[in-house]
Amino acid sequence: MAEKKYGHFDDDNREYVITDPQTPWPWINYLGNEDFFSLISNTAGGYSFYKDAKFRRITRYRYNGVPMDNGGRYFYIKDGDTVWNPGWKPCKTPLDSYECRHGMNYTRITGSKNGVEASVLFFVPLHTWAEVQKMTLKNQSLETKTLKVFSFAEWCLWNAATDMENFQRNFSTGEVEVEGSTIYHKTEYRERRNHYAFYTVNTEIQGYDTDRESFIGLYNEFSEPQAVTEGKPRNSFAHGWSPIASQYIEVTLQPGESRDLIFLLGYVENEQDKKFVAKKVINKEKAHLLIQQFNTTEKVDAAFAELNQYWDNLLNIFTIKSGNDKLDRMVNIWNQYQCMITFCMSRSASFFESGIGRGMGFRDSNQDLVGFVHQIPTRARQRIIDIASTQFPDGGCYHQYQPLTKRGNNDIGGGFNDDPCWLIFGTVAYIKETGDFSILSDQVPFDNQPGSEVSLFEHLKISMNHVINNLGPHKLSLIGRADWNDCLNLNCFSWDPNESFQTTENKGEGSKAESLMIAGLFVVTGKDYVALCKQLAKEAANSSEGTIAGLAENDYLAEANRMQQAVDQMSEAVKQHGWDGEWFLRAYDFFGNKIGSDENEEGKIFIESQGWCTMAGIGLEDGLCDKALDSAKERLECEHGMVLNNPAYTTYHVEMGEISSYPEGYKENAGIFCHNNPWVIIGETVAGRGNDAWNHYTKILPSYVEEKYQTLHKVEPYVNCQMVAGKDAARPGEGKNSWLTGTAAWMWYTVSEFILGIKPDYEGLLIDPCLPSTAKEYEVVRKFRGGEYHIVIKNPDGKEKGVSRITVDGKLISGTIVPCSPGKHEVHVEM
């Protein structure tokens, strides 16, 4: 397929502008950032939900449907005999003009046809359980236009899983109510449910429909609803089957005249004793109040301005001026924005994740935290407590939990032995950003069981102990069900195609299969834990009570010493048993055989262990890190990034599990897993190799990819995706699984702290850049603990690593940590 452009960045407005509705894949955006969320494509496809995309799905969407992107919030405009949509779909009537602007938690879709322009602004106002759809109709012709406007939303019957399965029940449960211009979805609003949804418009309507088949017509499609083509609503009332909400509005516009219509899709929960105002009559008081908040253009415009100000504040916490537009737009806008979306969604709801099978991941959410903690530290704090509450007393944890209930997901269970380490990673990042040590004293339960509470610090301690207590024959970390690579299942031995690799019971007996990835992760987080304990010793010594989280200075020093010994022992085990001669092994399987070794015919080298062991600095002084990084560059790098393993597996290996079940070049079998490319990039900065770090970074940076490969890349060019097809694939460079990926947080963490080198630390901001030799100067504004730091970094000699001097407000400081203090500060750094 030939390359073409479908859009471009608009940095001034913080938008990506799509100019062709027929993108290679639906290019989406997210609305909402608290409780009410919507996914919206460039043609207005998608759906809305409250908190949990599985249990509180409000509108229906058809994944993997034909045609693609099937279902959404649609507006049909009938102008004479012509029926069209502002977003092109679902009618696909050729438009005279089309534009979609995806911004920060809003999308504006504009289309025109035969002298009429329709522009729809979609957003979820702050602190609001509703999606606003502000439609502006404008007559650009020289004649009077009489238009027939039909709105459309299809209700989901709350549980998105059973909505697609249990039709013998579903076709009898749907219930609606119509009051003026508002259509209420009250399915199952009886004894068990206290919530309902509604769809309204701020004008008198001339008709409506609430039954899908009545509106569309039997055997018709969304592209040709019978009520629209005939220009006559049916005023249908749904009793079971498939309830919808469609308002019919007649609009007359003189030449040059425009008119706003405000549609509102909302969600309401009532207290149990206030569910009804009369028998079977739902209490609509909260809905009425919500409708009144957004029933005029002025109110909607004010709410939209408030949303934009919110994003101004968030994105001004860290800004860069480098002279490189592609870098600046990702750092200042899109990378931070994607990090906020992954905070809200984890891996639950995208156009690749159905919102049904996955909730919030223990590992995922801890990693995501480093991408947003500087923006919303209070919410980061709560997220840490929620995550820790799903831990078990032995330090293990549920792999996932549901956002609505915050309870662990029993279907997935636990046993992923990297998970506990990530709690250290996330908590340390929070404390370094905020200086809030009090979180460690918070009492947090195990498995959300009342009465089991211990301090968060105790949770961190048992997380470390979980690794120490689960070592294999080479004194390396046991892998358990899997490590970060969920598809490396060394104890599964699955021949049954009907079972899941992740959830089937391990068949390997005993504790044998070991992970070098977890070993490297343990050394990194173990060092963080040791440093935290030493800092807590200082804090306890200076505390009026002499303790922090119930422990005194000597307790923390003893714990630091204990864990340092464990870290040193793991490092030695890696050097002794995990070094293959030119790179780090990936693992030992159940039988004690090497994985990721030059001895193997396939899968000789893996990216994960090269990343984590070099991030940990294991063997740095002995040259092991340089050798491993050189090997990764030589054997894993290709045009589109670094593949996960090489060579790809061409046959199924039962002793390795799911990784060898994928076709070559896709997903975990030698695909470019963008998530782990930053691990090698950070490893490059640890080794002081700024040029290599920059080269790896820009290969997967969306703004660089967007410039060359919009068609080939397929998915959204303004955010990272999880996977890009590797060099062994049928279509190298094709992206999949966009938006909800740990790549977002890792790219942010990598560029902000390791390339640009602005690192939050306990005592202040640690300045330690690692740059390409072409980078001679850049400026960063960083807001941090009540201070604002204007940091100018100059690199006249093109050094890759090493700070020679730092001045703060004109005064030379000792070392590379800029101390915390309120107010504005000028920081000048020379390399």
In which residue ranges do the predicted regions lie?
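Anionic coordination/interaction segments
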Residues: 1-364, 378, 383-386, 429-433, ...
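Aromatic-rich carbohydrate-recognition surfaces in CAZymes
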Residues: 78, 360, 364-365, 369-380, ...
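Hydrophobic, small-residue-rich alpha-helical packing segments that form membrane-like cores
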Residues: 105-107, 157, 456, 509-524
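Beta-rich accessory regions
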Residues: 127-130, 136-148, 193-194, 202-212, ...
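Active-site acid/base region of carbohydrate-active enzymes
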Residues: 319-333, 378, 382, 387-396, ...
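Conserved hydrophobic/aromatic pocket- or pore-lining residues that grip, position, or stack substrates
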Residues: 334, 368, 613
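Solvent-exposed loop and edge beta-strand segments that line ligand/cofactor-binding
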Residues: 350-365, 408-417, 501-519, 593-616, ...
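Non-catalytic carbohydrate-binding regions of carbohydrate-active enzymes
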Residues: 402, 539, 546-594, 626-785, ...
